[in-house]
Curated annotation (Swiss-Prot):
Pfam families: Ribosomal_S17 (PF00366). It comes from Burkholderia mallei (strain ATCC 23344). One of the primary rRNA binding proteins, it binds specifically to the 5'-end of 16S ribosomal RNA. The gene is rpsQ. This is Small ribosomal subunit protein uS17. Part of the 30S ribosomal subunit. Coiled coil: none annotated. InterPro entries: NA-bd_OB-fold (IPR012340), Ribosomal_uS17 (IPR000266), Ribosomal_uS17_bact/chlr (IPR019984), Ribosomal_uS17_CS (IPR019979). Keywords: Ribonucleoprotein, Ribosomal protein, RNA-binding, rRNA-binding.
Length: 90
């Protein structure tokens, strides 16, 4: 038999934190551009994900990378893996 190493390729997405009001949870807005099948125009599609934030360290406006994990709760199956860019404070 072939001894192959099993690697888990978890999906990662980059989005903006739009809410951090829940305990240990942030809401991340992920936007992507999709070409319209008929008109050919690029349209911005978006989706919100609830992501696990163990230490409550991320604030609204932060650009974060989230990674797919096992389900933590009914609506939460993603976890924040790293901070890409902090929000600018004015």
């Amino acid at each position: 038999m072939n001894d192959s190493v099993k690697t888990s390729l978890k999906r990662t997405l980059v989005g903006k934190v739009v809410s951090n009001k829940m305990d240990k949870t942030v809401t991340v807005l992920v936007e992507h551009r999709v070409k319209h099948p008929i008109y050919g125009k690029y349209v911005v599609r978006s989706k919100k994900y609830h992501a696990h934030d163990e230490a409550n360290t991320y604030n609204e406006g932060d650009l974060v990378e989230i990674q797919e994990t096992r389900p933590v709760s009914k609506t939460k199956a993603w976890a924040v893996s790293r901070l890409v860019e902090a929000a600018r404070v004015i």
